[in-house]
Every structure is written in C-alpha cells, then in structure tokens.
UniProtKB/Swiss-Prot annotation:
Recorded GO MF terms: prenyltransferase activity; tryptophan dimethylallyltransferase activity
Protein's name in the database: Tryptophan dimethylallyltransferase
The keyword Transferase belongs to this UniProt entry's keyword annotation: yes
Family to which the UniProt record says this protein belongs: Belongs to the tryptophan dimethylallyltransferase family.
Length: 459
C-alpha cells in the first residue's frame, strides 16, 4: 500500500496550481509548510471550505510575515519558536482535533537599525489579521507590549551595546491562531528577556509587575496571580523553575486569559507533580484526577531525567539533535477562579519520534479517542513521507497536557518545515535571495559541509 503523503492533500494541490507569489521566498515558504498544514486540516475533519479559507489566509496574511526563506548559507533572523530558529510551527489539539499555528512576524526592517530586535513587525501582521476576525481586541496586548518589550530608544541602546545582549533570547513577541468553525482566536506570546537586560529588572519582576498593573483595572486576576507568585517565591533562591514569558488572548478583557510560563530545569516526575499541584496548593478532586494522567503520560513518554538547560546556540538546519531540554508549564489566571490552572509541557525534542507516537497512541486508546489513535502515526509519517521514520527525533517539540472540567486536553507541537515532497521536489536547490527582509542573524551558522550530519527533509 502506498504511504500517505501530505503533498497529496487536495487543498494544497489545488491552491498550489492557482496561487501566484510576490517573490521566491514566499513561494518556498508555501511549498515547505502548506503540505503539512493542509494534511493536518484534512485529517482533523475540517470542512472543505474551512480548509481553503485557512490556507488562503495563511498564504495571504502570514507567509509575507515570515521573512526570507531559511537556509544555512544566508543570514536570517533566528526565532525562539524552534530550536532551528525557524519562525513557524503547527500544533494540534488532539482532544478536540483543533489545528493551531504560531509564528514570529518578521519584516524588511527586522534586524536593521530601524528594528534591530524585531519589536515592531508584529504590528504589521496584526493589521493584516484584524479585518478578518471581529473578536480581536488589542487592549491587553498593548499593555503587555508596552511593559515587556523594547521601545525604540531601548532598542537603539542595546544595538550599540550588543555585548550586553550576548546569548539573551532576542525574540520578543509571537502570534498564534487557533482555527475553529471558520474563524480563528488570536493569541500573543511576549518574551521580556531583552527588557530585563535594558532595565536591570528580572523577568519575574517584569512579568508579575505588569500583570499587577493590569489588575488595577481587572482585580479578579489578582487572587490567582498572588497564589502563583507565592508558590514561586516559596521555592527559594535555588529554585530550578523561573518565569520565562507571558501570553494572553487578543479578545475583550472580559473573556481574555493571561498565562504565565515557567521554565523548569529539573526534568523529573516530582518536579512536574510540584508544578501541577503548585507545591500542594491544588488538592481538589479534579487536580488529583489530572495528576494521575500526568503520571500516566510520564510513564508512557519516558523523558530523560536530570537537570537540563537550553543550549546557547540555535541548531543549524539539517543537524540531527543530540540534546534534551527542560520542562515547561504555564498557569492560566482565570478571572472567576482564585487558583491558577496548570498546563504542563513534556519536552520531547530529541527523542525518537516513533516511540513518542507509540506512547501517544496508547494514551489516545486509553481515553477512547479511537480515531486519533488510529490515524496519528500514519498522519505524522505523511508530513515527511521520504524520511526514515524510525530514525527521526525532531518532529515532536512538545506535548502539552491540561485537565479541566474532568476532561483531559493534550496537544502536540510539531516540526513544520520542508514537509511533504520537499525532499524530492528540488525546490530546496533554488537560489534564494531574501527580498523582503534584512533578516540579520543573532549568529551565523557554522559550515555544515564538514559534519556530514543531515536528516531527510531539512537542507
């Protein structure tokens, strides 16, 4: 039987025949990512009109904001979104079969004197998306953007004092779209690492200070904020967990949710249990039911335990990862609940992808998600049909898990670059000259020609 191939997805094939692109970079982005995107929508049983709508929106409103097409031979902006510095990632909520994607907007000024740390490109992307979704509200976005990202003067100062930045995360903001019922919900993710450098404040001080200022207008978020901060402080100065970023829904303040993300360097079941229960502060029946499923996932996935940290440099495209990364968790500050709601992340990047897929399939079967269990591995293979699947270890970046209203929610975050027939289509041999973005790198990739280490699908 012929193996499934994402490039055979009908919506991708039809639109590829119809589309014209403004430049070669946008064409390459489409053929690199759209096969997987189209296949994911198709397998998740989106209606045909919705498949076309979401793919057209992606082509018209998002691809122009992805910058030059990444290669190892040309400088580019390196995004924190993936270990390869690529600015786009698809994910799937397996519980509800909801497709999502995240991207870091990049434009022609990114990395130049006009915007050395990519502070402003996000506004251009928002202008493209605002007319398409009436529910978008930027009030909370403006608040966090002002408090947690660089202004023009701060950007100029750091650009002239680059030694202060060093290996600090340079990504400051990302956008994400949840695709449902022909519409999309827009979210933002804000990284205040550069703001911490220029202000001399810690990320903890910046994030919690900003949310507290917002609580003056929205006091209902104060109780869960206080509980979360008390938990973090109770772990002491030698804690292996620390705030990393904040996110919120770009909808009306009455409906929006704030999430504070913690990086947990200690990879262990005990550390994950501590995050899940907020050090024992959450002990209700629903929390304990969810905890049993966290333990089940831990046993199935088999993360490598120990103290982990993010390696400083990004991985050059094509290099097989040989690393294990820290855990992550976020805590939602609901306006009608004094207790923060946890979501934990199993960092599976660098693990054998077929073993991860087998673990997930078992979990799906136990939950009664029979269709997801039946199709998950086959669909995963279709995204990279020409790869040696038994050797892949870069597809699953994260697996997230939360539990609310006695219902489990699990999502997978997947490598979304050079998918489908890319490896055999010779598109990667095109001579790419970045036309729309300066794409200045945080560092230039090393010469890979001497390593001899590549994997099918990335070049």
């Amino acid at each position: 039987m012929k193996a499934a191939n994402a490039s055979s997805a009908e919506a991708y094939r039809v639109l590829s025949r119809a589309f014209r692109f403004d430049n070669e970079d946008q064409k390459l982005w489409w053929h690199s990512t759209a096969p997987m995107f189209a296949k994911m929508l198709e397998t998740a049983n989106y209606t045909t009109p919705c498949q076309y709508q979401y793919l057209i929106t992606y082509k018209e409103c998002v691809i122009p904001s992805l910058g030059c097409y990444p290669t190892n031979s040309a400088p580019r902006w390196l995004s924190i979104l993936t270990r390869y510095g690529t600015p786009f990632e698809l994910s799937l909520n397996c519980s509800n079969s909801i497709v999502r994607y995240t991207f870091e907007p990049i434009n022609q000024h990114t990395g130049t004197d006009k915007d050395p740390f990519n502070t402003h490109a996000i506004w251009e992307s928002l202008q493209h998306l605002l007319p398409l979704e009436k529910s978008i509200d930027l009030e909370w976005f403006r608040h966090f953007k002002h408090d947690l990202t660089l202004n023009s003067e701060e950007s100029a100062f750091l650009a002239h004092n680059d030694r202060l930045v060093g290996g600090t995360i340079r990504t400051q903001n990302k956008l994400a779209l949840d695709l449902k019922d022909g519409r999309f919900a827009l979210k933002t993710y804000i990284y205040p690492a550069l703001k911490a450098v220029v202000t001399g404040k810690t990320i903890h001080e910046l994030v919690f200070g900003s949310v507290r200022r917002l609580a003056v207008r929205e006091p209902r978020i104060l109780p869960p904020l206080n509980m979360l901060e008390e938990y973090i402080r109770s772990r002491g100065s030698k804690s292996t967990a620390s705030p990393r970023l904040v996110s919120c829904d770009l909808t009306s303040p009455a409906k929006s949710r704030i999430k504070i993300y913690l990086l947990e360097q200690m990879v262990s079941l005990e550390a994950m249990e501590d995050l899940w229960t907020l050090g024992g502060r959450r002990r209700d029946a629903s929390t304990l039911e969810g905890l049993s499923l966290v333990r089940e996932l831990w046993d199935l996935i088999q993360l490598s335990p120990g103290l982990k940290s993010y390696p400083a440099p990004y991985l050059p495209l094509g290099v097989i990862p040989d690393e294990r990364l820290p855990l992550m968790a976020n805590f939602t500050l609901h306006q009608n609940d004094p207790v923060p709601e946890p979501q934990v992340y199993f960092t599976t990047f660098g693990m054998n992808d077929m073993a991860v897929a087998d673990a997930l399939t078992t979990f799906f079967e136990r939950r009664g998600w029979s269709e997801m269990a039946r199709t998950y591995e086959t669909t995963l293979k279709s995204y990279y049909p020409h790869a040696d699947h038994d050797k892949l270890n870069y597809l699953h970046a994260y697996i997230s898990f939360s539990y609310r209203d006695r219902t489990p929610y699990l999502s997978v975050y997947l490598q979304s670059f050079e998918t489908g027939d890319w490896a055999v289509a010779n598109l990667s041999e095109s001579k790419v000259k970045c036309q729309d973005a300066a794409c200045q790198p945080t560092s230039l990739p090393p010469d890979l020609s001497k390593t001899g280490v590549y994997y099918s699908g990335l070049h």
